[in-house]
Design a protein with these regions (language model features):
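Short, charged early-sequence alpha-helical segments and their helix-coil boundaries
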Residues: 38-76
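Amphipathic alpha-helices that form helix-helix packing interfaces
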Residues: 9, 54-58, 82, 86
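Short terminal alpha-helical segments
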Residues: 1-33
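General N-terminal targeting signals
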Residues: 30, 45, 61-64, 89, ...
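Generic structural signal for hydrophobic core residues of well-folded globular domains
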Residues: 12-16, 31-35, 59-62, 79, ...
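Low-complexity intrinsically disordered segments
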Residues: 69-133
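Structural recognition of alpha-solenoid helical scaffolds
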Residues: 5-8, 20-23, 51-54, 71, ...
Length: 133
């Protein structure tokens, strides 16, 4: 029996933390729940040959099997859980920053304000991505 590409490339889909892995994760999620997780296809341009093969295998497999592949569903649930955990960490860090004294912050008030802006933007992006409510 042929192995599901969602099992074959699971480590990339679930544990990958680089741009090509992120694109493949987004591609899988767009097949899993396209209305909630639309795909910016411009990321195709960043795939090297090995990741392009993974993309093509996943697309062909999904075309034949849809959501009936338990490896596909499992990988997507893991991606969704990872993204939610990341978004919660960002929100927690933002909350900690907002509760802290800017004058006691390492780097001073300016660094504190910069960090708040960064984490606020990242949190807002995570809400827009539907990674967190």
């Amino acid at each position: 029996m042929i192995e599901s590409p969602f099992a074959k490339y699971r480590s990339i889909l679930v544990d990958g933390d680089y741009s090509a892995a992120g694109f493949l994760q987004s591609f899988a999620m767009s097949m899993y729940a396209g209305a909630a997780f639309p795909l910016d296809a411009s990321g195709l341009r960043n795939l090297d040959d090995a990741h392009m093969v993974a993309f093509q295998e996943m697309a062909a497999w999904f075309r034949r099997h849809g959501e009936s592949d338990p490896d596909f569903v499992d990988a997507c649930k893991a991606i969704k859980a990872n993204r939610a955990a990341y978004a919660r960490r960002i929100k927690s860090h933002l909350d900690d920053l907002l509760a802290s004294d800017p004058d006691s912050y390492e780097g001073g008030r300016g660094e504190h304000a910069s960090s708040v802006r960064f984490y606020q933007r990242e949190h807002e992006t995570n809400i827009a991505r539907r990674w967190i409510d």
